[in-house]
Design a protein with these regions (language model features):
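Structured catalytic-domain cores with a bias toward divalent-metal coordination
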Residues: 1-319
Length: 319
């Protein structure tokens, strides 16, 4: 069920009908791949890792309808957690984040090759052979709360440089992910400092705001442009959001992982609040006060889903 806070956000987006893309073209449903026949990287843009994050589906639908094709290398466009996406209901919009478990906490070989079973794991195992060959990934997401868009670049220098190359959005977060499991952007070589593979995860704004779809479309075409997969002229016809004059980078020290079923914040944080003093109480986990670990602490993506084992938020600092 949605939380009370979810209900304060109207659903201003309509999920596109993606049934026409079901067959795919490489033997994996809802995955389309185009090969230029020329040397170059395998680039992938993925959507609906979480089924209630509509902007990615809108962006990939836009790419496919406008026949995005690579000038070199290969381009894959994929709808990931389709089962969750198909269950989206505007009257209960948070319920379709996943069916059985979070699709974006499964991305280790141990989990993917293990004995567990779920709707999300079955789908992850289907798309794994495709992801294994991807060199550069843009994974499109959105957020529960109405805060500024974020580029989640990971803790490595290669991620920071990739985010800087993208140039959007203004805020780049250098983070370590979640204790509950590894994200797709951290899969294998993406999180290996010695691998040329690289991945970005963009959070385009609040889940159902129209602006999130505008940024998602812009990010998808801009990603292809900066990699030379399409021409500047092609990209220019689809770019809807101007890049900031300067990006700001937040280095994350880690998440706060919820321990009890009685977690709550002391204020309705939405994210990017900068708390001046270390030791400021921002919430309670049962009887334990949750405090900022250092001065000028930036609160990253405070969660409305407050379950034991989940990340309540991440702590960071502008660098």
């Amino acid at each position: 069920m949605p939380t009370k806070d979810d209900l304060t956000y109207p659903v201003s987006l309509t999920p596109p009908d993606i049934s026409a893309y079901r067959a795919g073209n490489i033997g994996v449903e809802y995955v389309h791949q185009f090969d230029s026949g020329k040397p170059g990287p395998h680039v992938m843009i993925s959507a609906v890792v979480h089924g209630n994050e509509l902007c990615g589906a809108i962006a990939v639908d836009h790419l496919l309808k406008n026949e995005a094709r690579p000038l070199h290398g290969k381009l894959t466009m994929a709808f990931m957690n389709v089962a969750a996406y198909k269950s989206f209901d505007a009257e209960n919009p948070s319920a379709s984040r996943y069916v059985d478990e979070d699709f974006n906490r499964l991305w280790t070989q141990e989990v993917l090759k293990g004995n567990r079973d779920s709707v999300e794991l079955r789908r992850a195992r289907e798309v794994k052979p495709v992801l294994d060959t991807v060199d550069l990934l843009l994974d499109i997401h959105s957020m529960q709360t109405a805060t500024m868009p974020l580029m989640m670049a990971g803790p490595l220098d290669k991620g920071r440089k990739f985010a800087k190359q993208m140039g959007i959005p203004e805020i780049v977060v250098m983070d370590f992910g979640h204790k509950a499991g590894r994200r797709m952007r951290e899969y294998e070589g993406f999180s290996d400092p010695d691998s040329p593979k690289n991945a970005l995860l963009i959070e385009c704004g609040q889940n159902w705001e129209k602006s999130s779809s505008e940024l998602a479309i812009t990010a998808a075409w801009r990603f292809l442009w900066i990699l030379g997969m399409i021409s500047e002229e092609t990209a220019a016809t689809h770019l809807r959001v101007q890049p900031p004059t300067q990006q700001r980078f937040v280095e994350v020290s880690g998440p706060y992982t919820i321990k009890t079923e009685e977690f709550s914040f002391v204020e309705p944080y939405v994210g990017l609040e900068e708390i001046s003093a270390a030791g400021t109480v921002i919430g309670y986990d049962g009887n334990q006060a949750v405090k900022t670990p250092y001065d000028n602490c930036v609160l990253i993506m405070p969660s409305l889903r407050q379950l034991p084992g989940d990340s309540a938020l991440r702590f960071g600092k502008y660098i």
